[in-house]
């Protein structure tokens, strides 16, 4: 208790205080950028806490004339408590990444209205209904016809324009330097994605007792450990582009014709395949969860086909858009492939093919790692958790886990996303 009180006193001295609904109103009134967005009278605001995440408080603030979302980072992991401290500086990196990515892809990133570093507080656009979290839409069996197009656009632009394919090494190093201080969030990822699932760890869990042997098999799989070590090293060492850092289906809000990417508090310069893999891997998890949500009225078979098509389209469209950007800017400031060296279309094409093949295999590896950790690690996904029958849930999870292990180990053998889809389908049976 004394330590907690001392920590609270230090935070107040630094200008930080956690806001509740009452103090949030006072804060808004004292902050012109937020007050202007809400307009009119600020004495009749509607405030709703909506944070269902693991780390932060999130409030929707509505007035007769406008709306904002307020997000405040806490100095600990919310889903665990103050026994697991966590830097509040993640709010700075989230605000910075939102602003940078919105500049590159304004159609799919919400606007930041206000950032208060001392308070670890972001005021941003309220992504209004009928937008919902993509994960919830996937659980409900809703099709999003533009999802693949939109996410391919987002990933191609945010990754290409923050890489050495577009930037000079000087500018790239400046970006890396800015985000390297987000080390605590990166270390959290290192722990929960690349370490804990492969050993006995305090916060690991699985659908017990059904998956106890499956979790043990992960911890005892030497080949899997060798592959995950390679991915962990790449995650830590390879500053390829400015990543979102947590691009799962809970970080995307959608309607049938709109896609908005939120929550980049894990942003850092890392391997592009980590973002791509997070998105594709979470779609594969959604695919394997569908049997647990099927009923007599809807067997979900048609929806499962739509998910597979979305996975395939997402990669293929990303590949197309990314290479198009590369070709468009091949004579620009990018220093990875200098025009005097790659001085023929044939040579550039070969370089692009090698680059994209490597990126494809990276994406498969990271996507598989993200799948595994959601089944035998600390933080699971609602896709599976909302399946009430534990035996049925475990059956869905086991298929996903076995699929992920196989893809991770054999990722370099795949030559197309179509081959991956066939492979995924081969695990979709008891």
Swiss-Prot record:
Pathway: Amino-acid biosynthesis; L-methionine biosynthesis via salvage pathway; S-methyl-5-thio-alpha-D-ribose 1-phosphate from S-methyl-5'-thioadenosine (hydrolase route): step 2/2
BP GO annotations: L-methionine salvage from methylthioadenosine
Keywords linked to the UniProt accession: Amino-acid biosynthesis, ATP-binding, Kinase, Methionine biosynthesis, Nucleotide-binding, Transferase
InterPro entries: Aminoglycoside_PTrfase (IPR002575), Kinase-like_dom_sf (IPR011009), Methylthioribose_kinase (IPR009212)
Induction: By sulfur starvation.
Residues that bind substrate: 56, 246, 373
Residues that bind ATP: 52-56, 71, 125-127, 263-265
Ranges in coiled-coil conformation: none
Function: Catalyzes the phosphorylation of methylthioribose into methylthioribose-1-phosphate.
Family the UniProt entry places it in: Belongs to the methylthioribose kinase family.
Protein name: Methylthioribose kinase 1
Organism: Oryza sativa subsp. japonica
